[in-house]
């Protein structure tokens, strides 16, 4: 064993500042000289429109997997892809990586990108977004937000997360480092929950700049990140007249007076039928008199002469108006008269 290999196998007990920056120890053939005991296989189906592309690139897929001692089969009749281990396979996890590769290829990811998942530091994530939004129109609109105009939003997500992202149908396929996959998943899920992706992109850009400053390594970054308030207003129609809530009282409201209670209070309850009838007639005649009075006033209103101003008040107004003198106009007249006198 060389010195470099001995250093890699050495287990460090020191605290780790950044777990994402840790190097994953490589798994070599010497670590598993006997290979795998049982044959493992994974199969996945692909849609009809991918048949032509997969048929063209399948020799490259077989060549790529044979380097890791894996077998690949393409069944065009059933529309399936199968990967299997062989007797020479020594990496037990490479079959899982190969399964992810054929899954990505079935989701319209090109072979040049899908084969990267076989690397140790590269992973993949297939995010299902079809059941996150109930209405089809909203789903299409929010999925389009994720892509952006001319794919600009998707490109910016790829640059910030170092991941390859593909939006296809009801899924979003992501391929890249594991930290970037977490960020892509957060952005996609929040976008489908009606949070515009530009907000998360801005936050990622700020975080990238803050990571460059070692003084802020142990500080809270929430004060630097933008805070966005939800401005969704309720679409419920508000009533024109809103009822004011009455003050809370622990006692129940008093019982309303009945007709008998009112008659007892006024003394009408103890009158006989003739007296009640006489009282009703009296009330009726009083109402008729008031109505006749109002009608006479309305008729006589046309015959009431208008009020005339007295002669003394009109003279006072004339005197008041005559006492007012326009000083500016008088000055202008005097200056004009002086000019005429000088010229003559």
Curated annotation (Swiss-Prot):
Keyword Glycoprotein applies: no
A UniProt-annotated Pfam family: KH_KRR1_1st
Compositional bias of kind Basic residues: 232-245
Region spans: Disordered: 232-260, 273-326
Protein's cellular compartments: Nucleus, Nucleolus
Primary subcellular site in the record, as a coarse category: nucleus
Entry coiled-coil feature ranges: 270-295
UniProt keyword Coiled coil present: yes
Gene Ontology BP annotations: rRNA processing
Compositionally biased spans, kind Basic and acidic residues: 283-302, 315-326
GO cellular component, one term: nucleolus
Ranges where the KH domain occurs: 125-193
SUPFAM superfamilies reported in the protein's UniProt record: Eukaryotic type KH-domain (KH-domain type I)
GO MF entry, a single one: RNA binding
Listed InterPro entries: KH_dom, KH_dom_type_1_sf, KRR1-like_KH1, KRR1-like_KH1_euk, KRR1-like_KH2, KRR1-like_KH2_euk, rRNA_assembly_KRR1
Keywords on record: Coiled coil, Developmental protein, Nucleus, Ribonucleoprotein, Ribosome biogenesis, RNA-binding, rRNA processing
Free-text function comment from the UniProt entry: Required for 40S ribosome biogenesis. Involved in nucleolar processing of pre-18S ribosomal RNA and ribosome assembly. Binds to RNA. Required for female germline development, cell viability during eye development and for survival of dividing cells and epithelial cells during early wing disk development.
Subunit structure of this chain's protein: Monomer. Component of the ribosomal small subunit (SSU) processome.
Family membership: Belongs to the KRR1 family.
UniProt-recorded name of the protein: KRR1 small subunit processome component homolog
Organism for this UniProt entry: Drosophila yakuba (Fruit fly)
């Amino acid at each position: 064993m060389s010195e470099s290999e001995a250093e890699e196998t050495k287990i460090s007990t020191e605290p780790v500042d950044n777990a994402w920056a840790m190097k994953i120890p490589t798994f070599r053939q010497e670590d598993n000289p006997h290979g795998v005991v049982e044959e493992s296989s994974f199969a996945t189906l692909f849609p009809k429109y991918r048949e032509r592309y997969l048929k063209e690139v399948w020799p490259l897929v077989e060549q790529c997997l044979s380097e890791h001692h894996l077998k690949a089969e393409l069944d065009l009749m059933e529309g399936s892809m199968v990967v299997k281990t062989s007797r020479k396979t020594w990496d037990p996890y490479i079959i899982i990586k190969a399964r992810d590769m054929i899954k990505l290829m079935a989701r319209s990811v090109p072979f040049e990108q899908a084969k990267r998942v076989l690397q140790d530091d590269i992973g993949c994530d297939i995010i299902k977004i079809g059941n996150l939004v109930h209405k089809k129109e909203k789903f299409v609109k929010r999925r389009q937000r994720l892509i952006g105009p001319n794919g600009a939003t998707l490109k910016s997500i790829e640059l910030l997360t170092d991941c390859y992202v593909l939006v296809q149908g009801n899924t979003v396929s992501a391929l890249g480092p594991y930290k970037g996959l977490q960020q892509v998943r957060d952005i996609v899920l929040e976008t489908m929950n009606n949070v515009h992706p530009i907000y998360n992109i801005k936050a990622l850009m700020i975080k990238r700049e803050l990571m460059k400053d070692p003084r802020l390594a142990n500080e809270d970054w929430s004060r630097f990140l933008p805070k966005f308030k939800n401005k969704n207003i309720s679409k419920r129609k508000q009533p024109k007249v809103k009822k004011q809530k009455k003050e809370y009282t622990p006692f129940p409201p008093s019982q309303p007076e009945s007709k008998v209670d009112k008659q007892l209070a006024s003394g009408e309850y103890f009158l006989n039928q003739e007296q009640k009838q006489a009282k009703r007639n009296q009330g009726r005649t009083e109402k008729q008199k008031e109505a006749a009075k109002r009608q006479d006033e309305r008729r006589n209103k046309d015959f009431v002469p208008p009020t005339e101003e007295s002669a003394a008040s009109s003279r006072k107004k004339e005197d008041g108006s005559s006492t007012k003198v326009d000083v500016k106009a008088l000055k202008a007249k005097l200056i004009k008269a002086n000019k005429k006198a000088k010229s003559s």
